[in-house]
Amino acid sequence: MNIRQSGKYYEYKTLEILEKNGFKALRIPVSGTGKQALPDLIATKNNTIYPIEVKSTSKDVVTVRNFQIEKLFKFCEIFNFCECHPLVTVYYKKYKIVIVYELSQDVRTKEKIKFKYGINS
């Protein structure tokens, strides 16, 4: 498998972008396994924690399942003593653009969420 085809590549690209923008960030290499509420990445800036799910697509849309969204909110519940904002970053490969979506509580009730280029952005 080509490294650009793997999620790991886009996780590292997101880390680079975050660090260039003054965030402290790290990758959680076991995020997709087990039942723990671990995001792909954790970033901090200005006393706020950002659990991040990283996605990439060669299409105009990407679907994120509820359990992936829910783990971001559960992570925030662990850190309820500070600001915590769950994010999803989507790499739209054909447009060569990254869009960051901040999640609101109402998405927790949905079975899956579709992020569509040009609609949610």
Curated annotation (Swiss-Prot):
It comes from Sulfolobus islandicus rod-shaped virus 1. It holds the Pfam family Hjc. The record marks 55 as: Transition state stabilizer. Keywords: DNA damage, DNA recombination, DNA repair, DNA-binding, Endonuclease, Hydrolase, Magnesium, Metal-binding, Nuclease. Transmembrane segments: none annotated. It catalyses: Endonucleolytic cleavage at a junction such as a reciprocal single-stranded crossover between two homologous DNA duplexes (Holliday junction). Its EC number is 3.1.21.10. GO terms for molecular function: DNA binding; endonuclease activity; metal ion binding. It is an enzyme of class 3 (hydrolase). The active site is at 31. This is Crossover junction endodeoxyribonuclease. Belongs to the Holliday junction resolvase Hjc family. Hje subfamily. Mg(2+) 1 binds at residues 40, 53. SUPFAM superfamilies: Restriction endonuclease-like.
